[in-house]
Amino acid sequence: MNDGCIVIPRRLTVFGMLAALLLAACSGSSTSIEEQAGGGGGAGGGSEQATQATSVSCEPGETDGELALYNWSEYIDPELITEFRDEFDVDVVEDFFPNNEELLARIESGSSGYDVIVPSDYMVGIMREQGLLMRLDTDAIPNAENVAEDFTSPPFDPDLAYHMPYQWGTTGVAVSLEVAGDDPEATWGWIFDPEMADDIDGRITMLDDARETMGAALRYLGYSVNSTTESELQEAADLIAETTDRLAAFDSDQYDDLLVGEETAVAHGYSGDFFAAFDANDSWDDYAYLIPEEGAVRWVDTMAVLADAPHPCTAHTFINFILDAENGAQLTNWTFYASPNEAAQEFIDQEILDDPAIYPPEDVAADLEFIEDTGETERMFTDLFAEAKS
């Protein structure tokens, strides 16, 4: 996806450009991985394409070459990459994607050369149906026993056959308390209500993501984020279109930096991005992250092995490494996203565990939805969102 060392992040934190430069310095570009795989995808990709396999048998800790990781940017502590490289004596090459649709398009093009990818929940179901994922050898992932019960039977992959959970969180609204007051209402109205948004006209951002942003509009209107009713989707698209004049941008890259940099006052985005930005800028008292009372998206990002992964055993070993209790805690302490790793809880910073915006209480969680694969309606989400933005 990225050209050279350019990184287009979804979960960009204000560890920001320094971390991005450090990662870029120790990572290959997508071009380099494609070259290793034999070309830029499709049937003409070259003679050294990996042979697709539906399953593999590996020993715990076994490696069969380097690790090619395709992840969201700024979504893993660089020290974990270094520790994995040193412990197993393998190189790690990282590339980054900005959203699930870009991820899918890249993998569908063929011969990506990637081993482990980090798709969100609903995308696992889509890729599984298309035969793009390898069935995991759970014998090679003994730390799978650390996965919390809530994450052991998800609807998109009920038996954890094709994925392991990585991180989870929510998508909501962050506001400047200078604008919103000390006790801001938890509502999507900060974006969609013209009266609430009147004083912050031009200082609002929304994610440049069809399912997330259409989902926010759907919940504000009282519908499911997974609606397949054309009239409801059109109503949501119309609401977004009416909102565009109030927006500074549709942005999935810098929204948290823009907020803490006081260029915007309200931002739609991912929980952990905001918390990391507040922490890095020592601005916890200046901003609030809100899970809207109308309901919002709860998501879980996952680790999966591609069906044509060149190094499937190294891939399994990496997944097992991340599922280690202390490594899982290190990941959460760095990203500020909730961990699906039950064994990691004792090593996670207490302030994170106690924060209801990171680990929502039951009454809030009851109004959260996972984004699901809506089949043929996916195209409608994409097309209507594109029309609304224009």
Name each model-derived stretch.
Residues M1-A24:
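Sec-dependent bacterial lipoprotein signal peptides
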Residues A68-N71, Y75-D77, E102, G113, ...:
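Extracytoplasmic ligand-binding site segments that recognize negatively charged/polar headgroups
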Residues M123-I126, V266-D285:
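A ligand-binding cleft/hinge motif common to bilobed small-molecule-binding domains
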Residues D257, E362-S390:
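Conserved C-terminal helix/tail region of periplasmic/extracytoplasmic solute-binding proteins
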